[in-house]
Amino acid sequence: MARPSVCLLASLSALLLGIAAVSRSKGLRGTESQREPRIPSQFSQEQRIAMKEALKGAIQIPTVSFSPKELNTTALAEFGEYIRKVFPTVFHTSFIRHEVVGNYSHLFTIKGSDPSMQPYILLAHIDVVPAPDKGWDVPPFSGLERDGFIYGRGTLDNKNYLMAILQALELLLIRNYIPRRSFFIALGHDEEISGINGAQKISALLQARGVQLAFVVDEGSFILDGFIPYLKKPFAMVSVSEKGAINLMLQVNTTTGHSSAPPKETSIGILAAAVSRLEQTPMPNMFGSGPLMTAVEQLANEFPFPTNIVLNNLWLFRPLVSRLMERNYITNSLVRTTTALTMFNAGVKVNVIPPVAEAIINFRLHPAQTVQEVLKLAKDIVADDRIQFHVLDAFDPLPISPSDDQALGYQLLRQTIHSVFPEVNIVAPGTCIGNTDSRHYLNLTTGIYRFNPIYLQPQDFSSIHGINEKISVQAYETQVKFVFEFIQNGDTDEETVPHLHEL
C-alpha cells in the first residue's frame, strides 16, 4: 500500500458499522449455484512447503520503488521470470492469456466457460518500499523463516497477496479447475509511487477493449484483532471507499547572504512558521458528514452502556463523540482530512543564509471534502503571501462502493470470510485511509473493495513500511486458502437469497 497506506485504519468505521448481534441480510447462493462440484481447499504437506518457499523467493527479489524516476528495474524483470518459473501451470494454460504492460506489470486474462457472467479483477502489486537494514532482526530481503514467521519487506505489503493469488490459481489449475466466470489478475509494478505506469496502463488497456468489471478486489483492510476497546473478538473490515490525497510543496524564496549578518527572517524561519500553523490548525472535524453518522445511529444499541446511550443521542452528544474521535490518531484520520509534514529541505552551508526553503505536506482527504476545498483551507491557515503553493499531485476521495445485499463483490468477500475464518462473525464496510492501485479502475466498475485476508494486530501495523515486517507461515497458507475459495465462489450466480445470520 502506498505511502504509508494501510487501510486497516478505518477501524472506527468497522466498529460502528459492524458490531451487530443479529444481522438481517441477504447472501449469495452458495454451493447450490455451482454447476460443478467444489474443489476442497486442502493442501498436501508438499504443497504447503512449496507455497511458503515460493513466497520466500519472492521476498528475496528487492523490487524497490524509490521514486517515480528510480525503480529497481533489474529486480522487476527478475520477478517476472521468477513467477514464470514458480507457477508454470498459470503460464501454460490454454484459457489464460498473459501480457506484460508498461514493461514490468503483468495482466492475466482467465477466460471462463460462461460468457454471460460479468468478469472481475484481482489486484496486487510487485513493488515494495525501501527497507534499510538498520533495526531489522534479519536482512529485510532475506526471506528468512524464524519461529514460524517469514521475514522481509513485502510479507504484508503486498507480495503475500500477490503470491497467494497466483499460488491459489496454480493449485486450482492442477486440479483441472475451469472457471465459469472470467476474471483478470493485474500485478502492478509501481503502486508505491502512484501506479501511473502499471495499474493506470492496465486499466486503460482494459477500457480500450471494452471491458466492464463486476467488481475489483485489491489490498487494503484486514481482519483486525485488538484494535477496538470492548471488542474482544476479531472482525473483518472491507474498505468500500478510499481517501483522496494532495502532495503540496510550500516554497519560500529570499535573498541569500552571510550568516554573520542575518535578516530578521530567513527562508527557513518563514517556512517553519507556516508549517507550524498547518500542524497546529487541523482541518475541520467532518463527523456527521457522509455515512458514518447514519451508521452510528443504526448500531448504537449494539454497544455496551454507557456508549449506547451516547450514540443513541447524537443530537446531544455529537460534539463529545467528535472530540473523543480526535484523541486517537487512528480515529482522528476517519473524521477529518489529515495533515502530515513529510519532507523539509533547506540550506547549503552552515554560514550561508539559504535562498530557498521547501516543505512537502501530505494531505489525506476526508470523503466529504475535495482537493480545491482543502487547498483553500490550507492557504487560509498559512495566510502568508511569501509562501508559494505548488501542487505536486492530487486526487479527490473515491466514491463509496455498494455493500448492500445486491453488491456481488462485497457479498462474495463476506461469504468467503465466513467460510475461511468461521471464528470471525463481523464483516463491516469501512474507509481506506491510504491509497491503492484500485483507484485507477474507477472507469471500469462501481464496485471496488479492499481486503487482505489475514489477521492484523496493533503491533503488526507499525511493521508495514517499517521494521521487521513479517507474516506467519500459517497466515500465508490461510491466505492462499482464501483466494482458492474466493475464485470458486466467484462462479456463483448473482442471485441472492434472504437468510438470518446470527453473530
Curated annotation (Swiss-Prot):
Keywords associated with the record: Glycoprotein, Hydrolase, Lipid metabolism, Lyase, Metal-binding, Protease, Secreted, Signal, Zinc
Annotated InterPro entries: Bact_exopeptidase_dim_dom, Pept_M20A, Peptidase_M20, Peptidase_M20_dimer
Details of cofactor binding: Binds 2 Zn(2+) ions per subunit.
Catalytic activity: an N-acyl-L-amino acid + H2O = an L-alpha-amino acid + a carboxylate; an N-acyl-aromatic L-alpha-amino acid + H2O = an aromatic L-alpha-amino acid + a carboxylate; N-(5Z,8Z,11Z,14Z)-eicosatetraenoyl-glycine + H2O = (5Z,8Z,11Z,14Z)-eicosatetraenoate + glycine; N-hexadecanoyl-L-phenylalanine + H2O = hexadecanoate + L-phenylalanine
Localization per record: Secreted
Binding positions for Zn(2+) 2 per the UniProt entry: 125, 157, 218
Active-site residues, Swiss-Prot/TrEMBL: 127, 191 (proton acceptor)
Gene Ontology MF terms in the entry: aminoacylase activity; hydrolase activity, acting on carbon-nitrogen (but not peptide) bonds, in linear amides; lyase activity; metal ion binding; peptidase activity
GO biological processes: adaptive thermogenesis; amide biosynthetic process; amide catabolic process; amino acid metabolic process; energy homeostasis; fatty acid metabolic process; lipid metabolic process; proteolysis
Cystine connections: none
Regulation of catalytic or functional activity: Lipoproteins are powerful coactivators of PM20D1 activity in vitro and NAA biosynthesis in vivo.
Pathway(s) annotated for this protein in UniProt: Amino-acid metabolism; Energy metabolism; electron transfer; Lipid metabolism; fatty acid metabolism
Glycosylated residue positions: 72
Signal peptide coordinates: 1-25
Ranges in a coiled coil: none
Family listed: Belongs to the peptidase M20A family.
Role according to the record: Secreted enzyme that regulates the endogenous N-fatty acyl amino acid (NAAs) tissue and circulating levels by functioning as a bidirectional NAA synthase/hydrolase. It condenses free fatty acids and free amino acids to generate NAAs and bidirectionally catalyzes the reverse hydrolysis reaction. Some of these NAAs stimulate oxidative metabolism via mitochondrial uncoupling, increasing energy expenditure in a UPC1-independent manner. Thereby, this secreted protein may indirectly regulate whole body energy expenditure.
Protein name from the UniProt record: N-fatty-acyl-amino acid synthase/hydrolase PM20D1
Gene: PM20D1
